[in-house]
């Protein structure tokens, strides 16, 4: 069975919402849309207080090379433009819009009819992705159009589509593939045209039998797209691991996938590409799994960007004794520090964890068992890196590859002594990165 070669773990899957169809979340009374909800430089606000905007209208422009346009997810009046705390607690510029109906920009095709023929040229597709503010929906939120600005000396041999969804609990991709498989295929065809790659490989874990069967059937009409079942193993969906599993190519340290002739996108991104290329619809909504062991009805909602997280949780119901709410999955997600914040691109899951699940085991001394080393998918030695970080020996951290850590959490998950290994390594990466930055000034 196809998989990456080193390490990996298999946490409890807990895909409680996999059978819950995607529903439209009620339109909120107001939205707060952050201008910096992507990797790179925040977009520059192009509206002012008092302006009336329509759904799909650009309200902030990504003017830097690595940036993305931001659009209104609703129609209404701009009432405030000011710093607003996001779920991490950090303040970012937010545009508050009082909702007045649901009027869409006239240039957007809002019909449910599937548009199959791709009429845009390669460059027009890339330009459309930029115009519509499409970013990677797998979590990183890297502006998609930048990936397809391929240097003239590079060639793309493979377009890889990450449909692994290896994080526990999250089922957004699962539902997208069941309910919007053809739109995803058309989006992938558009990306093939933009990249010049001869083939696209969809990597999907073999625990999704129903999805694999459905995708394989739909893919029969798309000869350049292959569905590739993979072994169920975390972090199968990590970029470098996916590349190794599907192509047997290795991305060198500090390099990007294009160096080995590969571009990687998420299946959710493929759906956003379809909307942009075929419907001229910007990225203004996200499909979010709302789940947890104590959640009465785990669900998948299509939610307008900028919707209040508090409103979403109140609508679903916060279980008693909830100790932590995470954006993303339990392995790589981030805890919400501020519940009075608003959704943004790439927030694929709201996970409510019971107090009993949040308690860490008592930390004891390292027993030198080496399990953290055996599960590291990057071939690092967490057993060495943690004490180096504790001793603030960041030069040695760098020499031992700390910057190659993807922060997947496998080492900490596997540690029988309950040591906060990945927490220390994350800190060490931050300090080491600052040292490297200062050195290169």
What kind of feature is each model-predicted range?
Residues 105-107, 136, 159-173, 294:
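Gly-rich Lys/Arg/Thr-decorated short loops/hinges at beta-loop-alpha junctions or inter-strand turns
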